[in-house]
Swiss-Prot record:
Residues 291-308 have a biased composition (Polar residues). CDD domains: fungal_TF_MHR, GAL4. This is Sorbicillinoid biosynthetic cluster transcription factor 1. Residues 10-37 bind DNA. Keywords: DNA-binding, Metal-binding, Nucleus, Transcription, Transcription regulation, Zinc.
């Protein structure tokens, strides 16, 4: 006997859990109760299959993320366009920083006192779904987005970090199968390009997470997956310079988007890899002109041998040189305010300075450049160096200023033999001051974008950064002289003279910052806020000592603080220094009011108003 009649039970019997007789069009129970008998013939499955909900959740997250990115880009394009009714030229911030915009824009017509920063939040730890990852671990992107990020990198990042050969990179950028080091480098390049872009800034979080994961995976992943060595030291895998470049770019990106301590850890990792690969000894065996011949042995390339190398070989060698000097500049300048000991010292470097950018990218045979110590000793040679080589020389000069300050702090005065130590101090001080003054005089004048005549000067933000760096060295030397205990009247007179030089240098920095167009802040070096804060701190501490401070003193401090406000929208280091500067200015206002009266009150009111505007726009 059948336990159940054929057909489906009606909804009323299913609700009551009663035995339906399945009579159509109305069963007996529904007929007795006077209810409508409803039978559902087709029902949906009782539950999802295994993994179906997880897949739907990933797809939904990806769709929502893309929609939010597109919505943010549309909102940014509609809100950040600058209208011509403001007396300024209309600039589309969603486009890349094109050289044609530089020709048409002007320096004086852009009002730096009305900041409109794009809102970039600090990077937060996120998890990227496996469906968005390629087998290499990279984030899956469309071909158009990859091309845009590569273009943005060479327009905005490469001018301040010129260590990659464009043609060589583009030859393998679109390949699906590349080495792990090149995959990490490609992802790091696109990560920092997105971080310095207005249209891809929201997408940089996922790119950063993928790049960081790829680099850390290369650290813990051995050739056979074991945590101990299974080969001899000589047969272990070599450190590819693309891996060092990826860590350096990640460190630059973290200066923009993360706390300074995290960025210092990434830069330390890059320097340690660089030391293991011995990139500082590339040209040790060039000839008898090598300055440091006591270092360990490493493969090197002599100038005569370089002329006979194929294009790919000498380009790779030059990339290694530029990788070393990029790490050297970052190591020197990241300690501008903290006096943190550097890890790369000029005494250990046996690598020639980088060749001119035009020759490097154009594929011309390299001209042998000089070494850093001999270039520092011949001040006349600095005029013929490229912008990147000048940046290396000036970064080393600033590093010597920090070492000079550290030596002065280690000596206590007065003590036995203090007179000879005082002479040594002023001898070092005068040499450094003369080198800094010569650098400020020989620097090419910074031109407005519409005044640039050539491709090199038109798109070279490193030249303006070099000038600011030379002025910052003058300020650092003045602070060192002020901090030292004066023994004689001559010491006091010398310190006052260096203060006058530093004051003029701080005004020049403020003038350069004032003339800079707002869109140029997307192409500034990540450690530029250190130099801006150094100048603002010097003007803040020296201005109250004068009886009647000039009006341009107040304007200089104001422009420097507003510049930090602009940079804070794209640079986390600038955001931290802006908060610190705001606290310093508030503390100095109470002291300065007693000395100077209402002028400082006006400055404080003006500066606080602009900082409040920037904080309001950032919070929105």
């Amino acid at each position: 006997m059948r336990r159940q009649q054929s057909g489906l039970a009606c909804e009323e019997c299913r609700r009551r859990k009663a035995r339906c007789d399945r009579v159509r069009p109305q069963c007996g129970i529904c007929a007795d109760a006077g209810r409508t008998c409803i039978v559902v013939d087709k029902r949906s499955p009782r539950g999802p299959k295994k993994g179906q909900l997880k897949d739907l959740r990933y797809r939904l997250d990806g769709t929502i993320g893309c929609d939010m990115d597109e919505l943010q880009m549309l909102n940014f394009a509609s809100s950040e366009s600058i209208s011509a009714s403001d007396g300024q030229e209309a600039i589309d911030w969603t486009l890349a920083y094109d050289c044609r915009e530089e020709r048409s824009g002007t320096w004086n017509h852009l009002d730096i006192s009305n900041p409109r920063p794009c809102i970039i939040t600090p990077i937060s730890p996120i998890q990227t779904s496996a469906s968005e990852m390629t087998p290499k671990g990279e984030l899956d992107m469309s071909d158009l987005m990859q091309a845009d990020l590569d273009l943005l990198y060479f327009e905005r990042v490469h001018p301040i970090v010129p260590m990659i050969h464009k043609r060589r990179y583009l030859s393998w950028a679109n390949e699906k199968t590349v080495s792990p080091a090149r995959a990490c480098l490609r992802s790091a390049m696109r990560t920092i390009a997105a971080a310095m872009s207005a249209q891809f800034c929201a997408f940089s979080d996922k790119l950063y997470a993928c790049t960081r994961s790829m680099l850390e995976m290369q650290d813990v992943q051995g050739e056979n997956g074991l945590p101990w060595m299974t080969t001899t030291r000589a047969s272990r895998r070599r450190i590819e310079h693309e891996m060092i470049q990826a860590w350096l770019l990640l460190a630059h990106c973290e200066f923009l988007r993360k706390p300074e301590q995290d960025a210092l850890l990434a830069s330390t990792r890059a320097v340690r890899l660089l030391q293991l690969s011995r990139l500082f000894d590339i040209d040790m065996h060039d000839d008898e002109t090598s300055p440091n011949e006591n270092s360990g042995s490493c493969p090197s390339v002599s100038p005569s041998t370089t002329q006979n190398l194929p294009d790919e070989a000498w380009i790779e060698t030059e990339e290694k040189r530029r990788t070393l000097w990029t790490a050297f500049v970052l190591d020197c300048l990241s300690s501008m305010l903290s006096d943190r000991p550097s890890m790369l010292h000029e005494e250990m470097i046996n690598t020639r300075l980088p060749m001119p950018e035009r020759d490097f990218q154009g594929g011309q045979r390299p001209t042998p450049m000089g070494f850093l110590p001999e270039t520092m000793g011949k001040t006349g040679d600095c005029e013929t160096l490229s912008s990147f080589a000048q940046c290396v020389v000036l970064a080393n000069l600033f590093g010597r200023c920090i070492a000079h300050r550290r030596l002065a702090q280690s000596v206590s005065f007065p003590e036995s033999g203090s007179e000879s130590k005082s002479r040594q101090f002023w001898m070092r001080h005068e040499w450094l001051a003369a080198a800094a003054a010569h650098a400020t005089r020989t620097m090419p004048p910074t031109q407005a974008p519409n005044e640039c005549k050539s491709e090199t000067t038109k798109c070279d933000p490193l030249a303006a950064f070099n000038r600011i760096l030379a002025y910052s060295a003058c300020i650092s030397l003045s602070e060192t002289a002020e901090a030292r205990a004066w023994e004689t009247l001559d010491d006091h007179t010398l310190a006052l003279s260096y203060r006058q030089v530093a004051s003029q240098a701080a005004y020049e920095i403020a003038l350069l910052i004032q003339k800079a167009p707002r869109i140029a802040f997307f192409k500034m070096h990540p450690v530029l806020p250190n130099a801006i804060y150094l100048a603002a701190r010097f003007l803040r501490t020296t201005t109250p000592h004068f009886a009647t401070p000039a009006e341009h003193d107040h304007n200089s401090i104001h422009h420097l603080l507003v510049a930090l406000g602009y940079l804070s929208s794209v640079n986390n280091l600038a955001r931290d220094l802006l908060v610190k500067a705001e606290a310093d200015v508030g503390k100095s206002a109470r002291i300065a009011t007693e000395v100077t009266g209402s002028n400082w009150d006006a400055l404080m009111g003006d500066t606080s108003r602009h900082i409040g505007m920037m904080e309001t726009s950032i919070s929105v």
